[in-house]
């Protein structure tokens, strides 16, 4: 099984589902400057804890800057047994351009 690609519009729709997880893998300063509401900062330092507290069938959307690095992180989570993993195409840059009112600062 592989991760799936998801658009920013599809991500916006999924935000209404309470069990969806948005994991932001950008650097801490970028995350603090602005992120998708409800997203969690995910890094090498906290990934083990992140994986322990999530369900394998829980939808997880990985967000990076432009949608490239998120693909590697999404692949890693699938390799660890997570079944419903997405890489958001366009990354936070596209999200902020399209939905500037939906950026938590």
From Swiss-Prot:
GO terms for molecular function: thiosulfate-cyanide sulfurtransferase activity. The keyword Cytoplasm applies. It catalyses: thiosulfate + hydrogen cyanide = thiocyanate + sulfite + 2 H(+); thiosulfate + [thioredoxin]-dithiol = [thioredoxin]-disulfide + hydrogen sulfide + sulfite + 2 H(+). The active site is at residue 64. GO terms for cellular component: cytoplasm. GO terms for biological process: glycerol metabolic process. Its EC number is 2.8.1.1. Keywords: Cytoplasm, Transferase. NCBIfam families: PRK00162.1 (NF001195). Belongs to the GlpE family. This is Thiosulfate sulfurtransferase GlpE. It comes from Pseudoalteromonas translucida (strain TAC 125).
């Amino acid at each position: 099984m592989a991760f799936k690609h998801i658009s920013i519009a599809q991500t916006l729709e999924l935000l209404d589902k309470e069990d969806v997880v948005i994991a932001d893998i950008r650097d801490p300063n970028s995350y603090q400057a602005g992120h998708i509401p409800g997203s969690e900062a995910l890094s090498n330092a906290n990934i083990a804890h992140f994986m322990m507290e999530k369900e394998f069938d829980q939808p997880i959307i990985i967000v990076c800057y432009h949608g490239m690095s998120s693909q590697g992180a999404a692949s890693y989570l699938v390799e660890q047994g997570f079944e419903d993993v997405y890489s958001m195409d366009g990354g936070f840059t596209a999200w902020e351009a399209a939905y500037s009112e939906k950026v938590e600062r």
